[in-house]
Amino acid sequence: MMDLAPILTGIAVAGLICQATAVPVPFKVEAILPQAEGAPYATMAAQIGKDMLASLIPYRVLKNGGVTYHLGDKSTPPLQVWAQEKLTGLHQRSSPYIRRAGRLTPSGILKHGDKLSFASSKNETTQGIYVGMEHSIGETSFPLRLIRAQFPKLAVPPIGQPCYDSENRLVGIVLGVSRKGTCHLLPARAISFLATHPEAKRVRLGCLLDINSSTPVIEGLINGGPLARAGIQTGDILININDTPIRNYGDMLDATYYLTGDKPLSIEVIRGTQVVTSKGILPTQDPR
């Protein structure tokens, strides 16, 4: 039996996980061989019925004891993926099979204490609880907030397992688990975004915020960066990005993660006693 605790700082791709019939929407997560010639990637494909929901390419695959795992049947160990880019290495592989986003839990509808569930390989449904959204696990921070859930210690979902809410809507896919039953999930919104925006690249605005601050104060700016060019100043407090409210560091992460990077932005900040609006800001796109 694999020790899943170390995966808190990374992602893993399950060899093959089939969602049980207890959940009305047939859902599976399947790892397939890389498609690009010479590319050292594994691909995680989340599929609903015959329609492709998402196809994610991890940034890099780790070797365990000098042995690289090859994909096979259900007994194949999960591929552990290094979080060097703090989950920013997830990219969408274009697929002609992408048709729809499936039945997803709307963003922000979950409340602390809401019931979550997943179905085991034995068709047994295990109940858990939604804890909240987190932008870091230990010393590892991420480019978007992950869903934190709690399941029984002896019945945690495996890596790659889809989890659902009380109305059987997809909440997210498990990225990491701990021995205490704590799980972190890639939100359904992120899966849908990656599926419907395969051309999207990571967006950078060139500003620094304090990860521990409860107020989104701009602590620093990168010279020549998008916000610096737009006249944003150190000490400004973010109000919104493209009319998305920014109340804290986590809001800032999500607001930038779900940008496609191909359209100018509008940003509002508080400067002293004034509200300042900057429009036409062109973000920097990460070419990777």
Q: What is each model feature region?
A:
Residues 66, 166-215, 272, 277, ...:
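C-terminal cap/linker of serine protease catalytic domains
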Residues 5-14, 18-49, 133:
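Protease-domain processing segments flanking chymotrypsin-fold serine proteases, especially trypsin-like
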Residues 42-44, 158-161, 217-218, 234, ...:
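Short loop/turn microsegments at loop-to-beta-strand junctions
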Residues 51-57, 164-172, 227-250:
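Conserved PDZ fold ligand-binding element
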Residues 109, 157-162, 226-237, 258-260:
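A short glycine-leucine-enriched loop at secondary-structure breakpoints
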Residues 200-203, 217, 230-233, 239, ...:
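PDZ-domain C-terminal substructure recognizer with occasional recognition of PDZ-binding tails
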Residues 26, 30-41, 48-125, 147, ...:
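Conserved active-site neighborhood of the chymotrypsin/trypsin-like protease fold
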